Every structure is written in C-alpha cells, then in structure tokens.
C-alpha cells in the first residue's frame, strides 16, 4: 500500500512539473504583432547600406504585378541586432542575416512570438549571403506572403458574415467578414462589397458550365471574355451605359494554381468602368470543379483612387482562398 501511495505521489509530482514548465514556456511565446505586409530585417547598418541590403530589397520590395502603380510586395523595417529585443522581436515576419556562418537558409516558426515566420540567411561572406538570397527569392516571398494571408484570414474570422444564400445557391462557403454586404444577387451570381475610406472593395462569385472554359492556348482570353460579359450583365456604373470590363492596355497575367485542393486559374489585371472614368486592380480565380461539372469563379476588385492598393488586394486574395466547395 505504501508503494502505491509513493508511486502516485511521484506521478503527480512529474505531471505538476510538466504543467508548470508548459505554462512557463507559453508565457514566453507571446502573440505576434505588426502591420500587414511589413517585414523586419535584422542586420547591421553597414550591411543594410551595401550590396546585401540591395539584394534583400530586390527580394522583398519586388513590385507586385497587377497594380496600377508600382507597389512593393513588402514594406521593410531594418533593425540592427543590438536593438532587436523586447517588443520588436514580436513582428510576424522576420528576416535575419548571419555573417561568418555556414552558407544556408533556415525557415523557422514561432521563435519569438506566435504566429511568426523567421527566415535566417547565412554565409561566411557577404557574397555568399547574396547568393542564398538570390537562390531562394521566390520561396522567401511565398513564405512571408502566405503568413500574411493567414493572418488576414484570422483577423476576418473574428466577425464572419451570415449570408446563407451563397451556400444555398452556389453550394460553397467563403469567409468574408460581416462588414461586407450583398450588392446584387441572382440564382448563380453574387456581388459582395465593402465601403472603405476612399472607395470600395468588391467580390464577384458565380458559376459557369463545365464547357465554358477549355484548356488550350487561349485560356487568358477565355477568362477575360467571361469576366467582361459578366461585368456588362451585372456590374453597372453610375453613368448610363457604363459597366465593368478589363483594361485592354494592360496585359493580364495568368497562372495555374490550387484552390480548395482543386486546379484553378489565377488571373491578375486592371479593370475599368467602360464609358466612365473608374478603374483599379483585380484578381480572378476560376476553380475547376470536376465533381460537380462546373467552374466556380471568384474575383476581387478594388476601387481606391489616389491610395495604395496592395493591402486591399491581399484582403481579396485572403477571402477567396477560404472558399470551400461542396
């Protein structure tokens, strides 16, 4: 009996210690912070002012395709290692430069806060660091951008919409916040919009017959023709005879991607209000729903004259990438 009691006390002691250690570690991992699309770069001033700094800016400040004016993918805040402590370590996205180390790159999560992505680029010389940056430029951007999309989705999920009609009519769910309102709806089309200080952010959601898009060399032209016809039918401007269309002077970008584990076409470009003076960027995803023999199209477009549109477009992409098809 004495042995059983002693064993029980030992077990409870270790469990208690484990819980204390767990709670102690959790207290050290605080919530991350920082503005959307802002990356902290931790490196010495002289490195930042030289060729390594130029290479970092070439990776992180690359202009985003599909915006009316050049905007960098990320805003960069350079921080010397000597002052990288306390609150400044809590930024959601951090790039660290380590000299006099083995050449390489490390992708870590939740090092100083959560959620957080920390990328460390190392090299024995500055030239090696530059090589690592250039060899991994796309992966670095993708890692940070995915983190920002996830963060925007997390923020928007705090106040989700409650429009059951989208699920009922289109057999899908999409996670936009409650500040959006339905501007127009039919049996197979929804126009959702949100008022912002300088204009509006907008979403179109609709479905097409499976035969509407054929995978051949004219894919981008097919997508543009469809969006223009849908825009003319459903999105009218304030001026009589004006409607949503694609700006012909700007070549659209098209790429293959995956949305909701299904093949999809991603198209970026500039929209205009035909016969009026309005325009802005759009991002369009046509999802191939083989099970239900249809295409589901979700497009985000922004009207925000005289202000940067990068963060608005990230919100559009973040919303669209929450879609779940039944």
Question: How would you name each of these model-derived features?
Answer:
Residues 1-4, 18-19:
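Positively charged n-region of N-terminal signal peptides that target proteins for export
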Residues 13-16:
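C-terminal motif of bacterial Sec signal peptides marking the signal peptidase cleavage site
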Residues 19, 25-34, 49, 58, ...:
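N-terminal "mature-domain start" segment
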Residues 22, 72, 79-128, 232-293:
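Signature of long, low-cysteine stretches enriched in small and polar/charged residues
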Residues 22-27, 44-46, 177-236, 244, ...:
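Secretory pathway targeting signatures of secreted, lumenal, and periplasmic proteins
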Residues 23-43, 47-50, 98-162:
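Solvent-exposed alpha-helical segments and adjacent loops
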Residues 30-93:
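N-terminal leader/propeptide segments of preproteins
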Residues 131-153, 180, 294-326:
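Surface-exposed amphipathic alpha-helical segments
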């Amino acid at each position: 009996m004495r042995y059983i009691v002693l064993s029980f006390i030992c077990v409870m002691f270790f469990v208690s210690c484990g819980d204390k250690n767990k709670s102690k570690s959790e207290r050290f991992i605080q919530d991350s912070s920082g503005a959307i699309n802002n990356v902290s770069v931790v490196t010495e001033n002289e490195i930042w002012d030289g060729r390594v700094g130029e290479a970092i800016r070439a990776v992180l400040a690359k202009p985003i395709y599909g915006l009316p004016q050049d905007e960098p993918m990320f805003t960069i805040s350079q921080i010397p290692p000597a002052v990288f402590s306390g609150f400044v370590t809590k930024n959601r996205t951090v790039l660290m430069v380590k000299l006099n180390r083995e050449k390489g790159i490390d992708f870590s999560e939740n090092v100083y806060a959560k959620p957080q992505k920390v990328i460390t680029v190392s090299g024995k010389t500055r030239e090696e660091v530059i090589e690592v940056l250039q060899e991994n430029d796309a992966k670095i951007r993708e890692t940070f951008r995915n983190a920002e999309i996830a963060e925007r989705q997390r923020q928007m999920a705090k106040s989700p919409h409650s429009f059951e009609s989208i699920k009922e009519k289109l057999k899908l769910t999409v996670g936009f916040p409650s500040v959006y309102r339905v501007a127009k709806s039919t049996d197979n089309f929804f126009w959702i919009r949100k008022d912002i200080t300088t204009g509006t952010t907008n979403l179109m959601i609709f479905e097409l017959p499976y035969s509407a898009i054929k995978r051949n060399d004219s894919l981008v032209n097919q997508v543009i023709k469809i969006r223009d016809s849908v825009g003319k039918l459903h999105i009218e401007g304030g001026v009589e005879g004006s409607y949503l269309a694609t700006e012909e002077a700007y070549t659209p970008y098209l790429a293959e991607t995956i949305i909701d584990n299904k093949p999809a076409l991603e198209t970026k470009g500039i929209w205009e209000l035909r016969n009026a003076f309005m325009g802005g960027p759009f991002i369009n995803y046509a999802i191939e729903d083989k099970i239900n023999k249809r295409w589901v199209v979700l497009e985000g477009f922004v009207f925000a004259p005289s202000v940067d549109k990068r963060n608005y477009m990230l919100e559009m992409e973040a919303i669209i990438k929450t879609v779940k098809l039944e």
